[in-house]
């Protein structure tokens, strides 16, 4: 939602005949009961064998914070309960040294709260390039170490193949294009090539 909502106007202008109704949810998927046509999720859980799945984009993560947060060489590390291994995933991908426990803080309940705290100058959080691209554009956040793949990806899920529904397929192609555009501003081709080999 953090990434999608600011871009809904662009989608509506390009596709005025398609109306999107958004639902924010997590946990087990039951698209039929929820009345949902398409779910956007990370592929870090098992969704069963009955759903059609289409890849959207690899996940790219990196430490982000306000410019002032990085005035110190070791800003406090912000954690979240919904992505408890985020710092470890980044360290694995970059082969950085282990976390110094003295620079950590109690975890936030949700991922987006840790990003909000990072923007408020409370420390550095591991951010998804998609979730923070607008803040990076505006200069509210910086990412001194750049971004690396964490081994996960975003997928679009539906009850039937996307090609069976023109509106659903249109949304799929738009999501892929918009995600790629967001990432391309902050991830160079050289970085993509280097980090593809770094993820086991």
Regions found by a protein language model. Name each.
Residues 1-46, 191-200:
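Central regulatory/effector-binding core of bacterial HTH transcription factors
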Residues 41-93, 156-159:
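Hydrophobic/proline-rich hinge and linker segments of small-molecule sensing/allosteric domains
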Residues 15-21, 95-105:
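A local structural motif
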Residues 37-39, 77, 125:
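Short, well-ordered beta-strand core segments
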Residues 130-138, 147-200:
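C-terminal effector-binding regulatory domain of bacterial HTH transcription factors
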Residues 99-144, 149:
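Hydrophobic hinge/microswitch elements
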Residues 9-11, 86-101:
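Ligand-binding cleft/hinge of the Venus flytrap
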Residues 3, 47-48, 84-93, 108, ...:
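Tryptophan-centric aromatic hotspots in well-structured domains and transmembrane helices
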